[in-house]
């Protein structure tokens, strides 16, 4: 075969490899910060495509989308334009775990994001396959494509996803492929070990798609959207919300004993159990065959039938991810209530792909082996569109800052779920596809759906991703919120017959003395609208989102205060930096495991070091004393 001749392509400030959910956010962020940016993708028809579930959000993930929006990212705006159903989950639980979830029109989502990218002034979108990096003096200085183009840049982001040496598995069938039968990238990650990178092999899977015209909906349970408006973007008005007649329902059904018998009878053909699949799969999104084996005592498992869009009859069978042979998949489908006559349009499959071991990353998502190279998304070992988009935004911001010659940007665990995720990856690593859960966030009461803008919009404005106009609106909202909180902390409600009758009707003791309106609102049976029956309303009616923020701030004030005190302790630890050139071999007294882990992960602060598995408080005390004593000769 004739060798492809290389040629000099254009120079850019930032190059992003891969235009999935991570790459799209990375490229938009870098470009909006004023950098000439190139976004490379294997196929222009796969930009921000949803090869698995046609949805955005859910527990923890929905909050990440709000954080992306608060920082100036695109995912929230894009799904608000293209959803077919919206639901707020966990409404019966506390505010820390409430999460928005949207059913997406996957084709409209892709088209809208692609058009947004095409209209961005500093951003060039180009189809092509990146085979290798341009590396000089230990620094990444660009990329080389399969057509021979050498594009140089000040910073590069790799967001290759499951296309990175992807391999699809369906029963006994195996072939090289990216997601959804797209072309894979076979050389880029294969070249990374020569630059000092350690790679892992992960796998994920997807369920079969069925023809919606062949589903018996009357045998399933309807799951409609919400009547009350909700949005992912803080900029989307309530007037844009779709009423129920314009939303599409999902439908609930279940596996049964017959389904389980079919699966058990064919486990000898299941790649997951025959040793064919080598990659590690996601713990929190197991295949149906894995569920049947691991949870053998359960008589049934939930399945949600979800529309893939308005202009397609393909339906996604959520909960039925599988890599069983095609004929077995058909038998499984026909054993399920409502799917007895369902026509399978696409079989489910497993896909294996390359992952960069995340201990090789800094909190900015820059790689340790190569300066100026950043990675994001499934390349870093995560699962999920939202996790990918959050990392993409952070990597794009930092690639953009590097190109501008500015210091890096990080998010702490107390700032955002994005910060929790990145800290988990770089500090603890992951041996399986990482999924964000509310339980991973120790400060989840202050990392809520409702307050993402209060946490992050000022940072987004400082980075140049939030317009002055939007920032002014945010400051006005913040001022209104604070003014009403101050007012409620000044107004005193005095006891009278009306107020005491109300209090006693809820089984409470009558008021003896006056009580502040803020304190009265903390009572579990009092909401803001009820409070206004006993005090004057503010001069201007309040937006319902501000009312929600007021209620949460006051009702959970004690818990929030405790969380903020813990955050203050964390920040003191985060302020204790570990010198970059520290020599762990020279520190006496460290436990062997601690010594090995510290040397491998190279934490940047004592707080990060304290979160490493195998590093105990005694090791942190030794390390702290060593740094404070300023043993410069050994440190440097």
From Swiss-Prot:
Its cofactor is FAD. Pfam families: GIDA, GIDA_C_1st, SAM_GIDA_C. InterPro entries: FAD/NAD-bd_sf, GIDA_C_N, MnmG, MnmG-rel, MnmG-rel_CS, MnmG_C, MnmG_C_subdom, MnmG_C_subdom_sf. NAD(+) binds at residues 281-295. It is found in: Cytoplasm. Disulfide bonds: none annotated. One of its GO terms (cellular component) is cytosol. One of its GO terms (biological process) is tRNA methylation. It comes from the Bacteria. Keywords: Cytoplasm, FAD, Flavoprotein, NAD, tRNA processing. FAD binds at residues 18-23. The keyword Protein biosynthesis does not apply. One of its GO terms (molecular function) is flavin adenine dinucleotide binding. NAD-binding protein involved in the addition of a carboxymethylaminomethyl (cmnm) group at the wobble position (U34) of certain tRNAs, forming tRNA-cmnm(5)s(2)U34. PANTHER family: GLUCOSE INHIBITED DIVISION PROTEIN A, PROTEIN MTO1 HOMOLOG, MITOCHONDRIAL. Belongs to the MnmG family. Homodimer. Heterotetramer of two MnmE and two MnmG subunits. This is tRNA uridine 5-carboxymethylaminomethyl modification enzyme MnmG. It comes from Levilactobacillus brevis (strain ATCC 367 / BCRC 12310 / CIP 105137 / JCM 1170 / LMG 11437 / NCIMB 947 / NCTC 947) (Lactobacillus brevis). The gene is mnmG.
